[in-house]
Amino acid sequence: HRWITGKHPRLFDPARDGFGGDTIARQFLFSAYQAELYRELQLSTDPTLRAIAGKAEREVRYHLDHAAQWILRLAGGTDESRSKIIISLRDVWPYIDELFVDDELTERLTGAVPRPSALRAGFDRTVASVMTEAALEIPQVQPAWAQGRSGVHSTLMGHLLTELQWLPRRHPGASW
């Protein structure tokens, strides 16, 4: 399938050599983002979003802690594990900025949802704390893409959508 051919976004790339640190790097960074998002959503003007965020924050904090502990273990382990987690973080890092881009939708939802850009400082503090403890440097890389929320995607999005639509197209009307 597509995962085998390599035609998919790097952010969703399965571990290139079986190294679980690729998954840990993605989980750590995305959980750091989600932790800020759900913390801020608890201040939402929408009571349903507040309730969901309250429950979700506890879960994502668990995932953040789990991934952070693995970052520390890998960075403090062998030379090979340290080198590989550095590569994993560097490979995922270009996709981080897109999480914090404000757009027209978030502007219209002011009060109900936080501005993505307002989440960046907390994210940076969380990530910097773990990276410092692990004696790792923040990767200095160019952002990969920053318009996905506004509907502008690379051609790789088509490959991802094709992969996601394979089952429903193969088995129309299928249900669990």
Language-model features, listed with the residues they occupy:
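Extended, helix-rich structural scaffolds rather than catalytic motifs
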Residues: S83-W176
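Internal, conserved structured core segments that host functional sites
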Residues: F12-H66
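Histidine (H) residue identity feature
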Residues: H1, H8, H63-H66, H153, ...
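A contiguous pocket-lining binding segment that forms or flanks enzyme active sites
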Residues: T48-G111
